[in-house]
């Protein structure tokens, strides 16, 4: 006998409830989209003229003394290139820790590199060292196994994700911590833009091993790196850092004058302002290496005006090896104005170049986690070092020139001859460039 289905007739009350539930869900969806895509820092449109150079005292007062803390003298900053340079140095620092290790990263994978750092942190925690690990909920949350987190926590490591993805706080979902910080015993620090995964290992020997740079810091500047870590640790874990084990008295370790510039949620974006002042002050050279380069209209204007003052403006950006092709398409939309304005663009050929650095007139350097893009300017929480030192600037220029030897110039004619599909992709990606 065939079975007959019973028709369920909803009453008026049930229909009204369902309608209100649907309206409520739609409203929550709109709120979520607004929070994710439209909440960002206020960014000022800069209208700057060339009135002083980076060698003049006015530049130091305008660019470096805008923020708290002010620049500190007496620092030593080493540039460590590629995984063979920075990973052994960072692991050695962790393994030599006596009191405290504070480690913050955007990307940590469960792979050979991630496990090496996991094991080093676990070994120190077992030895009685206070170990704190703070990873971004997006950059690492999908890539680090829960078993690795559990292993660290079981031996006493304090662990937290910054802005976890699976959270009711949708207003935080799009605001990522892009900072990279390692501070050991409050005396030695590392920062830059690297990730802790196998593609950052090696010596950029092939397309599977990226080219990147990390800084090793000694001197009073280390306390600023510690402060930057503590800011996010308090927000995430609810614990302050104090005492001589975290903030020892730091004497001079070198002669470099520098400061750590951090961006915060809903505050003025300090890095774009510093970049803008440096662009306006340049008299000889602006050399920029940037992994994800989608400059704003204001930044393009300042760079083109610098060329008009006979400043040599050059970019090194990723070439055929790029892990974010859509970001590359969004960035290329700005190439036309840059190239027509006399800016030179070079594409790095051997592998993905992940460096985020600039040097102006061999005197002022900016180095760290920030890309030259709207996301770093308006959304992410970044950490960069602003360095006012000619000897360090000379090293930055030497690094740029070395990378330039492995790069090919991208010309205005190439830009004009790009394919129909390249143009379509650029047009489609441009509205989303702040999210890429």
What annotation goes with each model-predicted range?
Residues 2-436:
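Charged, low-complexity intrinsically disordered terminal segments
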């Amino acid at each position: 006998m065939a079975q007959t289905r019973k028709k369920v007739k909803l009453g008026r009350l049930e229909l009204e409830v369902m309608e209100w539930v649907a309206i409520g869900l739609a409203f929550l969806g709109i709120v979520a989209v607004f929070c994710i895509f439209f909440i960002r820092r206020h960014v000022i449109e800069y209208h700057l003229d060339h009135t002083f150079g980076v060698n003049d005292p006015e530049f130091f007062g305008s660019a470096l003394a805008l923020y708290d803390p002010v620049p500190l003298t007496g620092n030593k900053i080493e540039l460590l290139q590629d995984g063979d340079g920075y990973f052994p140095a960072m692991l050695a620092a962790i393994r030599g820790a006596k009191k405290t290790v504070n480690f913050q990263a955007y990307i940590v994978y469960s792979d050979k590199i991630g496990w090496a750092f996991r094991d080093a942190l676990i070994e120190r925690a077992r030895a009685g060292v206070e170990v704190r690990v703070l990873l971004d909920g997006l950059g690492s949350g999908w890539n680090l196994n829960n078993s690795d987190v559990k292993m660290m926590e079981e031996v006493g490591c304090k662990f937290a994700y910054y802005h976890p993805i699976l959270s009711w706080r949708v207003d935080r979902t799009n605001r990522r911590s892009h900072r990279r910080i390692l501070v050991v015993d409050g005396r030695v620090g590392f920062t830059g833009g690297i990730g802790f995964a196998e593609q950052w290992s090696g010596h950029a020997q092939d397309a599977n091993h990226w080219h990147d740079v990390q800084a090793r810091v000694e001197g009073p500047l280390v306390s600023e790196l510690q402060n930057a870590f503590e800011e996010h640790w308090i927000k995430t874990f609810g614990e302050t850092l104090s005492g001589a084990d975290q903030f020892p008295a730091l004497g001079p370790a070198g002669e470099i004058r520098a400061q750590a510039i951090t961006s915060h949620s809903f505050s003025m974006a300090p890095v774009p302002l510093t970049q803008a002042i440096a662009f306006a002050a340049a008299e000889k050279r602006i050399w920029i290496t940037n992994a994800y380069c989608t400059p704003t209209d204001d930044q393009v204007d300042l760079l083109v005006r610098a060329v008009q003052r006979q400043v040599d403006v050059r970019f090194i950006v990723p070439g055929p090896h790029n892990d974010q092709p859509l970001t590359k398409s969004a960035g290329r939309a700005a190439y036309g104005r840059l190239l027509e304005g006399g800016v030179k663009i070079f594409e790095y050929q051997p592998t993905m170049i992940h460096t985020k650095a600039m040097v102006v007139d061999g005197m002022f350097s900016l180095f760290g986690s920030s890309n030259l893009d709207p996301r770093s300017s308006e959304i992410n929480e970044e950490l960069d070092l602003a360095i006012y030192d000619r000897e360090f600037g000379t090293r930055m220029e030497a690094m740029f020139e070395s990378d330039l030897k492995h790069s090919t110039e991208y010309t205005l004619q190439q830009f004009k001859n790009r394919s129909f599909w390249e143009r379509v992709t650029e047009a489609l990606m441009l509205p989303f460039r702040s999210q890429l």
